């Protein structure tokens, strides 16, 4: 009977794990809607700033900000957005695989790679990559990240860019497409790529700026980059909750399959045990 007790113990253990997975799935479902709301709120902010930047740039053609100018690439920088927690399927792995492909390409060309990492899972992996230099790490931003938690990382990378220690800046994160689909994304942040709907191509009227339009442009560019990084973080959070929800659902479903298999095995073992006992009783009775 010890074998039957072990099987019952395994069934109970898997049921307990299944309950935990189901609870985590439901928590992720609730968090997805909250994160999607933040994502949708932050997106128009960045888009509006970009429109104003395009407008100001169009009115000051004699002044070209360095953030719009291409340079000879000797060093590149990445903001890498990962998760602080696991149990999110292949979310981090898929992003890191995409990054490693880029890193190998730059490394083969002799280009320095500098990283600002957001999320402990990315940091623990990327510390082992010898071809990169980590200049900033941000952990524990939580499920409701604030811009203030990211400003330090943004300013470190922008300072390196301003000092010509980085010639191109990227943002790597998981783009939220829908609840079932998340895609690794590497977005060029600097130099800023000209908008397809550039206001330069059409007639426009200008504003009177106070302070000077150049001062305003400098400030807006920093706000725009901060908003781009923040948008990447909230999209990655939405992707994380979706991936965790699906991972926990899969775990719960797989647990049910294993329980059914163990029940079948348990019933067969129990039937065999009963048959053996009946055979022994019948044999004993015939001897008497």
From Swiss-Prot:
Subunit structure: F-type ATPases have 2 components, CF(1) - the catalytic core - and CF(0) - the membrane proton channel. CF(1) has five subunits: alpha(3), beta(3), gamma(1), delta(1), epsilon(1). CF(0) has three main subunits: a, b and c.
Membrane topology reported for the UniProt record: Peripheral membrane protein
Entries under Pfam families matching the protein: ATP-synt
Gene3D superfamilies registered for this protein in UniProt: 3.40.1380.10, ATP synthase, gamma subunit, helix hairpin domain
GO cellular component: plasma membrane; proton-transporting ATP synthase complex
GO molecular function: ATP binding; proton-transporting ATP synthase activity, rotational mechanism
Keyword NAD: no
Subcellular localization, as worded in the UniProt entry: Cell inner membrane
Name the record gives this protein: ATP synthase gamma chain
A GO biological process held by the record: proton motive force-driven plasma membrane ATP synthesis
């Amino acid at each position: 009977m010890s074998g039957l007790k072990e099987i019952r113990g395994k069934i109970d253990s898997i049921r307990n794990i299944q309950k935990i997975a189901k609870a985590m799935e439901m928590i992720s479902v609730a968090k997805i809607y909250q994160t999607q709301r933040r994502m949708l709120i932050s997106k128009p902010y960045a888009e509006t700033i970009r429109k104003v930047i395009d407008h100001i740039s169009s009115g000051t053609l004699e002044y070209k900000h360095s953030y719009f100018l291409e340079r000879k690439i000797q060093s590149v920088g990445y903001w890498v957005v990962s998760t602080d927690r696991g149990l999110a399927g292949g979310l981090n792995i898929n992003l890191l695989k995409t990054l490693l492909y880029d890193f190998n390409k730059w490394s083969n060309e002799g280009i320095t790679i500098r990283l600002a990492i957001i999320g402990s899972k990315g940091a623990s992996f990327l510390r082992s990559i010898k071809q990169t230099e980590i200049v900033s790490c941000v952990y524990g931003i939580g499920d409701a990240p604030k811009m203030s938690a990211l400003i330090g990382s943004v300013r470190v990378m922008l300072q390196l860019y301003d000092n010509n220690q980085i010639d191109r800046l990227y943002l790597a994160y998981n783009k939220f497409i829908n609840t079932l689909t998340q895609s690794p994304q590497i977005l060029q942040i600097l130099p800023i790529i000209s908008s397809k709907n550039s206001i330069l191509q059409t007639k426009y009227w200008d504003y009177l700026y106070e302070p000077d339009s150049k001062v305003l442009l400098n400030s807006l560019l920093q706000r725009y980059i901060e908003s781009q990084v923040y948008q990447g973080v909230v999209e990655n959070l939405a992707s994380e909750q979706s991936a965790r929800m699906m991972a926990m659902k899969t775990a719960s479903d797989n647990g049910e399959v294993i329980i059914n298999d163990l029940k079948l095995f348990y019933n067969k073992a129990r039937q065999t045990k009963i048959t053996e006992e009946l055979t022994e009783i019948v044999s004993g009775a015939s001897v008497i």
